[in-house]
Amino acid sequence: MYLLNPDLPVVKPGYKGNLWKNKQFDGGDYGSSQASFGQLIQWQLGRNPQQEEKKADKFRLKVHRNTSFITSDEDVIVWLGHASFFIRINGVSFLTDPCFKDLPMLKRMAALPCSIYDLIGIDYLLLSHGHRDHYDERSIKQILDQNPKMELLLPLRLSELLGKRRKQTNYPEAAWWQQ
């Protein structure tokens, strides 16, 4: 079965939607693989060829604490750590994949350039997918509470993670190749 949002246009001719198999999305032609339990254990216990290099790399970008980008009228892109960005284009502001707190077994590598409480007046929240390093419930809840008029831009079925908030938030969900 293929799923897409019937209310949104599809920009790729002939695209049927995202492949939905066994109650989950499947990459289909884009490469999907289901690892066996044994392969998972082997991957987790196996040697990582980049492990030493990663441990030795102490480079971190210097974080400049500043809130002027939030209230400025200028077009701007500000990195907030990992996959989180504040973007303003022609006066419209976007926040991507907010993950502003340490997660279990996953620590932030850089501080925020501002307080999470400074992130107000945001027009759109863009969530790329539901992995924990892109979808942090605590950060999303706080951003939604601080920006009650903010709209969400979501991939298909991600609204299910929003729980009760689904009813109080405006969001279109899109398949690949939908605008």
Predicted feature descriptions by range:
Residues 1-104, 114-118, 154-179:
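Metallo-beta-lactamase
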Residues 12, 17, 106-154, 158:
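Active-site metal-binding motif and surrounding structural segment of the metallo-beta-lactamase
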Residues 75, 93-96, 124, 167-169, ...:
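Functionally constrained cores in energy, signaling, and assembly domains
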Residues 90, 148-149, 167-168:
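Short glycine/proline-enriched coil/turn segments at helix->beta-strand junctions
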Residues 101, 131, 177:
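Catalytic metal-binding/acid-base residues of hydrolase active sites
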